[in-house]
């Protein structure tokens, strides 16, 4: 017989005894495992021989967590590549975090820039009232209390700075306040980063009055330690918005915390407002699109 395989077994699977089948399966299971080890060793040897620019491109295609948790443990060469700037600059470029051809000298720590950029988002929940007062704490309902209204509202204007913003919080004839406390570690920012690098923490808020009534507005932001001691603070003080000021237009207030020292674990954001004419209803300061960002 000139066919492939053993002529006694080809085309006759029914003649194989039950005792022989487990042995054949066991042998088949052992061979792939050995083969996998050989293939892995061959692949590692091949990668180790790659020129550095090519190896960097191979590594840059892997998830960041695998690079830090696994690849840097493979060998000294890989550890140096994972800890170095060129790999993370390449990942930043590939994922659109920096323009192609970015200059390496622009930053000292591209790995840190990468992880901060991937985490970058508004850390405040429900900043525009889409979920009523959900996510806000220490809510003070002075006068008739807070109310969520649709833009532009009575005697107000549209919020042209961000088309996605559709609502705002309106305050009343006595002070209305609300706050949020952000746990930075729970949001993915680790102790060493906060204590050593101290990335910039940027706070922004938008407020407005009505064209038919004056109002007061205030913003206070505190950086707190693990035991809620105040390590840094910003306060706008009471800002008076006179009647007919900018036709009820929206104004931005912002502050950037830098070099705030080690130990910061929480950010407490609090703002509030009231009207200055003491009219029943919701003639006080309006707030929306509040934000807290940790910048790369």
Curated annotation (Swiss-Prot):
> One Gene Ontology cellular component annotation?
endoplasmic reticulum
Pathway given for this chain reads:
Protein modification; protein ubiquitination
What is the protein's membrane topology class? Answer: Peripheral membrane protein
The alphabetical list of record keywords is:
Cytoplasm, Endoplasmic reticulum, Lectin, Membrane, Microsome, Ubl conjugation pathway
Gene3D superfamilies per record: 1.20.1280.50, Galactose-binding domain-like (2.60.120.260)
Please list the residues that bind a carbohydrate: 210-212, 278-279
| Biological function | Substrate recognition component of a SCF (SKP1-CUL1-F-box protein) E3 ubiquitin-protein ligase complex that mediates the ubiquitination and subsequent proteasomal degradation of target proteins. Involved in the endoplasmic reticulum-associated degradation pathway (ERAD) for misfolded lumenal proteins by recognizing and binding sugar chains on unfolded glycoproteins that are retrotranslocated into the cytosol and promoting their ubiquitination and subsequent degradation. Prevents formation of cytosolic aggregates of unfolded glycoproteins that have been retrotranslocated into the cytosol.
The molecule here is called F-box only protein 2
Which organism was this protein described from?
Homo sapiens
